[in-house]
From Swiss-Prot:
Annotated EC: 2.5.1.75
Iron is among the record's keywords: no
Residues noted as binding substrate in the record, renumbered to the chain: 25-30
Subunit structure: Monomer.
Residues given in the record as ATP binding sites: 23-30
One GO term of the biological process aspect: tRNA modification
Names of the cofactor(s): Mg(2+)
The reaction(s) this protein catalyses: adenosine(37) in tRNA + dimethylallyl diphosphate = N(6)-dimethylallyladenosine(37) in tRNA + diphosphate
Protein name (Swiss-Prot/TrEMBL): tRNA dimethylallyltransferase
Alphabetical list of Gene3D superfamilies matching this protein: 1.10.20.140, P-loop containing nucleotide triphosphate hydrolases (3.40.50.300)
Keywords annotated in UniProt: ATP-binding, Magnesium, Nucleotide-binding, Transferase, tRNA processing
Organism: Rhodopseudomonas palustris (strain BisB18)
Amino acid sequence: MSVATSDMAEAIPERGRAVLIAGPTASGKSALALALAEACGGVIINTDSMQVYGDLRVLTARPTPADEARVPHRLYGTVDAAVNFSAGAWVEAAAAALADARGRGLLPIFVGGSGLYFKALTRGLSAVPAIAPQVREDVRARLEQGGVEALHAALARRDPTSAARLNPNDRSRVARALEVVEATGRSLTDWHRDALPPLLPPEQVTALFLAPQRDELYARIDARFELMLQAGALDEVAALAARKLDPLLPAMKAHGVPALIRHLKGEISRDEAASIGCADTRHYAKRQFTWFRHQLPEFEWVAPDRAAERLERQTG
C-alpha cells in the first residue's frame, strides 16, 4: 500500500463520502479501486455497462474471482446477455447497492467507464418508463424489414427534434427514440427534461477521471486484447454466439464480440478479428475522453500513477 493510499484510509471514511473512479478502458481503474477498498473498508460498485453481463467476464475485463474475494464487489456479472439492461435499471440496482454499503458502514466506490451511469449518479436520469416488449419487437421488426433509413423517417414524423439530433445511421438510438415516442406518446427529449434526482449530488462525492497518455493507453489496449484471447475470450464469444441472440442487444455489441463472431464463422482470420477489436476499443477510449471532458467537467483528471495521491489530497 502506498503512503497516499494509507492516508486515504484515515481521511475518506470519516467524511462518509462516495468515491467515483472513471476513465477510459484499460486505464487502471480497477486496481486503484481495489487498493482503496482494502485500505478504507470499501465496496466496489460496477459502473460499466458491459461488465454487468455474466456472459463476458474475460472480454469485458471484469475483476477476477481472486480480486472479488478480497473486497465486496457489486453489480458485476449479474445480468444475462439476453437482457437489454437500461441505464434506468442500473440506477435502480446502484441505489440498492449504495444503501447496502452505507447500512454496513462501507465506503461506496463506483468504478467504470460508462459516462451515462456516472451522469445519472450525480445529475439524475430521465424518467422514461419501461417499454412494452410488444412495442420493442414491432420497432425491431420494422428496422430489419425497412432498414434504418425508413425507421429514421418514421421517427422524423413522430419526433422531429430527436430525429434531427440523432445520427440517421445509428440503428440502436433511432430505434430507441421511436420506441419511446410510440410507447408513451412523448418524445425522448421531453422525457429527458423530467430527470429523476441524482443518487449522489456532486458535493457528496470525490470524483476522478484517470487520464493516461494516449500512446501508452492504446498500447495497453492492444496488449490486453491479446491477453483476453489467450485467457478464453474466444470461447466466451462462441458460447454467446451459440445462443443466437438479437445482434442489437448491448452484450452482442461489446467491443470484440462482432469481430470474433465473424472469425468463428470463417469470414476473417483471428489476427484480423483481434485488429478490429483493438481498433474499436481504441476508438471507444477516445470517445470516453471527449464525453467526460464535455459532459462531466466536475471530474478531476489525473494521471493514473498520481491518482492515489490526489484522492488523499481531495479527502484529507
